[in-house]
A protein has these predicted regions:
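Rhodanese-like catalytic fold shared by cysteine-dependent sulfurtransferases
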Residues: 1-20, 26-58, 67-111
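Short, surface-exposed ligand- or partner-binding patches at beta-edge/loop junctions that are enriched
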Residues: 62
């Protein structure tokens, strides 16, 4: 019987500087607003992109609210990666006043 892998969590306001931040939201959410240093891989594409993710450092995984990122962090941890879920997601990121950029030149926001 497979059991979910326990993954640590962090609130976006407490995210250390310089981490590898993996954003697993959909393309339209990413375009609307994301952390400047984040790397975008849609949740549905994680399996195909697994080999391109760093295996030698912690991956902080973020989505809009923390649910998809929790699933992604557990799935990646089950494959041997060291993951941390950003439990309040980009919604918490915006509330904490952390920087955001958009891909389409509009005012960044959480979609």
């Amino acid at each position: 019987m497979n059991h979910p892998v326990a993954v640590p969590e962090v609130m976006s306001a407490d995210l250390p500087a310089g981490v590898f931040l993996l954003d697993v939201r959909e393309d339209d959410e990413w375009t609307a607003g994301h952390a400047p240093e984040a790397v975008h891989v849609r949740l549905g594409d994680l399996g195909a992109r697994l080999g391109k993710l760093p295996h030698d450092r912690e991956l902080y995984v973020i989505c809009r609210s923390g649910n998809r990122s929790a699933y992604a962090a557990q799935a990646l941890a089950a494959r041997g990666l060291n993951t941390v879920n950003v439990s309040d997601g980009m919604t918490g990121w915006a509330v904490a006043g952390r920087p955001m950029v958009s891909e389409d030149g509009t005012e960044p926001h959480v979609a």
